[in-house]
Each structure stands twice: as structure tokens, then as C-alpha cells.
Regions:
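Non-catalytic cap/lid and distal C-terminal segments of serine-dependent acyl enzymes
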Residues: 1-163
């Protein structure tokens, strides 16, 4: 988990400032990913909403407890969006930032998507209970957990985001 936290530190302290310098200081960023990348993308926007304002997460797992087995500490908690978002208070300063963000989640319901479907259902309930608006899109039973579908989803949602 320490290496994972160092990855966050690199993104926030080195990568974003370097790109901002070259791109005339754009303040907010979109984060996206598929499968484990969607998990990381969601974790980034919910942990650091001052830096990110748009999320496109395709086929992610948002309750990461299954990755840790019996091991739990502060880092596993802060890398489990279902855990910390369920417990965030409604008056937390981040709540307003979440409400101003575009949050898009998509999952197919075909082969290899069942855990992702269950995870998104669980997470969408948490977001609803926290009064955070998110577009949670469940695609058909022919839509499986793989790159050909993520390419289709990415093209579709990018058009929606940049309308």
C-alpha cells in the first residue's frame, strides 16, 4: 500500500503540476479507466476532488475489500471507495465538490462483469444515500469485460461529456 500512496503522490505533486505548466494552468482534470483502472480513477476523484472534476469509470470494482483479504489498515480503508464514501459526513467540505463533478460509471452485464455489476450497484446506492448525483449505466447482457466494449463505451461517453 505504501507504493500505491507514492503513486498518488507522484500524480498530485509531479505529473499534474508538470502538465499544468505546459497547458496554461488548467485547474481540474478528468480521470478515466477500465477494470482496475476504473477502480483507481474512482478512488482518485473521491479522495482528491480538488484536483479532479470528471470521472469515467468502466467496469470497476468499488468495494476493494476483496483485494486485501483479512488485512485492514488506514491505507486499505482510504483505498476502498465504498468504505470511505459510506462514512463521509454530509457536511464534509468535499461533498460540494462531488456534487459539482461529472461522475459516470458504466458496466456491461455479460461475461466476466458480475462482480463489477454487484460492486456498481452497491456503490450507486452509497452515492444516492449521500445525495451525490452519478450516471450509473448498466449495459446489456452481451456487453462483456474486455477492450472491444470499453472502446465503444469510451467513445459514447466522451461524446456525452464534451457536448
Amino acid at each position: 500500500m505504501l507504493k500505491h500512496e507514492l503513486w498518488f503522490e507522484y500524480i498530485l505533486s509531479e505529473l499534474i503540476p508538470s502538465v499544468q505548466e505546459k497547458m496554461n494552468n488548467y485547474d481540474k482534470w478528468m480521470v478515466t479507466g477500465a477494470s482496475l483502472g476504473a477502480t483507481h480513477a474512482a478512488n482518485l476523484i473521491f479522495r482528491f476532488p480538488k484536483q479532479f472534476d470528471t470521472l469515467l469509470a468502466l467496469s470497476g470494482i468499488y468495494d476493494t475489500e476483496l483485494f486485501y483479504g483479512d488485512y485492514h489498515d488506514e491505507n486499505t480503508y482510504h483505498n476502498n471507495p465504498c468504505a470511505y464514501m459510506k462514512n463521509i459526513s454530509l457536511d464534509h467540505p468535499y461533498m460540494e465538490l462531488y456534487k459539482q463533478s461529472k461522475l459516470i460509471f458504466c458496466v456491461g452485464q455479460g461475461n466476466w462483469e458480475q462482480e463489477c455489476v454487484e460492486s456498481l450497484r452497491q456503490f450507486s446506492t452509497i452515492l444516492y444515500d449521500q445525495h451525490i448525483e452519478a450516471w450509473c449505466d448498466f449495459w446489456g447482457y452481451d456487453v462483456y469485460h474486455d477492450w472491444p466494449w470499453w472502446k465503444v463505451q469510451l467513445q459514447y461517453f466522451m461524446e456525452q461529456i464534451f457536448k
